[in-house]
Amino acid sequence: MTEKSIEVFQDLYLRGGSAASIRDCILSQVREPWQHDPERENDMKGFAGGDEDVIVLVRASFDDIDESGLVLWQEKDGYRVSNIVPRNVGELGIMKYNVILRDFVSLVAQPAAQGGGFEIDLTSPTQTLDDWLTADSAAALRRFSRLANKSTGASHPLDRERWFTFLITVHGTSKRLDTEQLARWLIEVEGWPAERAQELAIDYEFALVLLEQYDHSRP
C-alpha cells in the first residue's frame, strides 16, 4: 500500500543565464494581477547588506487568498523564491502559499523563461518519508512507529530499543528529516497523538546533537 504523502511548501528556483538577464526577463512579464514593488525591494536590499539582488513582486488578492508579496533572492546560479508574505493576515499556510507560487510560475516565470532561456525548478507539493531519509533510516523509523505503543511513545524497553536503532541509523547519514517533518509524519501519516509526536521530535533533536558531540569529543 502506498504511504500517504504530506503537503509541503514548494520551492522555486530560476537557474541559468546571468542574474541581470533573469531579472530583466521576469520584470518584462509582470502585468496584472502581478506588479513590481521597487520600494519594498530597495528596503530589502538595504537590510540585506550584501551584493545579492532582490526582486519583490505583489500578487493581487484572489478567491480567498490575501494580497501577497513574493520575494526572489539572488543565488550564485540564479534566483530562488525565499518567501511569500500576505499583507493583511498572519500567514498563508501551505496550500495558499503553493497556489500563489504556481500562479507566479504560470503567469510570469514560464513566459519569462521561454524568452530568456533560463530553467524553472519547482519542487513537488507533497513529499513522503523516503524524500527525507535514506532507505535504512526510513525502514527503522517505520518499524519503530508501527510496533510501538502510541500512547507511551518510546518508554517500553522494546520500543526504546527500536527508537535508538532509528536514531543511530540516522546519525550515520547526512540525509535527515527535521523535527517538524518528523512530528508531522508521526501525526498525519502514522496517527500518533500530537503530544507524543512532539515529545519524540524533541528527543530526536536532542539525541542527534548528543551523538554528534560525542563523535567530536572522541580522540
Residue spans for each PLM region:
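Charged interaction segments
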Residues: V56-Q181, W185-L208, E212-S217
